């Protein structure tokens, strides 16, 4: 379980319609719901605000969470989507890092004292994905309440990780481990979670097709993920069955 997820749930139990937890933390919650170990540690919560539902009260509660956790690093990027990063809480019950995305301008209370932040390739990729209307629609379609937390369901996490993988592969000077992380998460989800077929927006579906065409994993890499008896072609076929049929 992601450190601090319980206290996050406690603070935001009345606001599950106003955000979605995505990324590795969402995977971890989904796996925990099924009493399965996700297989990798994630220290941060990636949160997307639902712009149609957000309220002043959510902003007030969010900032209370930051104050109560006594986060020592508080930063904000320029441009859209808005991106906030809160890191190194003094209260160890709180998540180690929170990354908050908003598609449109959303003024958090008490923004004085936020330092400018330069976003890295992985954040830049996710920001671009969230600005895309088709992916935002998929985000809304794929959310579910698990353990009192609004999360992106496993079968809907995969298209986002596939798009991030495609984007990072096109960039130069990107750490290969960042690229493999998304692919490996997809493999873990397919191997361990019961998944439903998804009807994706056309653009998302086309990108899934591109990902499947480019997907490859060696037998040795699968063994390192503790997955045996499965080949690369088996994974590609499973993805086709869920997203393309």
What residue spans do the PLM features occupy?
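Compositionally biased terminal segments of proteins
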Residues: 1-245
